[in-house]
Amino acid sequence: MEEKKMQYLFGMHPVLEAVKAGRKFDKVLLKQGLEGPQFRELMELLKNNEIPFQFVPGERLNRAVRGAHQGVLAYISQIDYVDIEQLVNNALGSSQNPLLVILDGVSDVRNLGAIARSLECAGGQGIIVPAKGGAAINADAVKASAGALMRMDTCKVSNLRVAAYYLQQSGFKLIAATEKTENLIYDVDMTGPCAIIMGSEGKGISQAMLDLADEKAAIPMAGEITSLNVSVASAVLMYEAVRQRIRK
């Protein structure tokens, strides 16, 4: 997404104070070669708060900001995130059989938004995304979700595998959507609490997440094209869960 379309703060002191105050950011751009005590303090805070950051040439910041950015540009989060414990508590508190989605490397913001929209329509409770290596939840994602991202819990985690294991220990079945199985989606019981794992558009689900999954499920393909767009595939699995729960 173009930087001028996003909400942001710039300047070393404003960003430093905002991070100290607990303001949520999608990412922070830092000019290459920054030094000094305030820079070191900011770096420590970004790491401790697991806020993604990137070093970029000063020209990029000059194009994005008409002002004294001092080498720091921070993009404000479009939504308020919850931690994994709060996500689980809210999900189990609102439904006997909650439905969650884990996005393992989905990089397109419109796909992310479309997945969130389908999940909300299917009665799902929340979505889990990686802090790094996935699509940013920005204005485009919120728009593509038709506001769904504002209506459900979103959890951003530094380690997807640890978060997924926590879900397992909390009673959720992990279902990986993959063609690397003979089990079709109709063969997998989705009537209880479950989290559907969806992989990246190009590589699919990582091996680490596949190894952790309780079940693997494939969508049957009858045509010559062998795969669906990730947002469409997500909706197919979600509504198979809905179908099973209605018939239960």
Predicted regions and their residues:
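Active-site/ligand-binding-proximal alpha/beta "capping" segment
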Residues: 175-230
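Active-site helix-initiating loop/hinge in glycosyltransferases
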Residues: 11, 104, 111, 227-229
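RNA substrate-binding interface of SAM-dependent RNA methyltransferases
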Residues: 17-23, 92-183
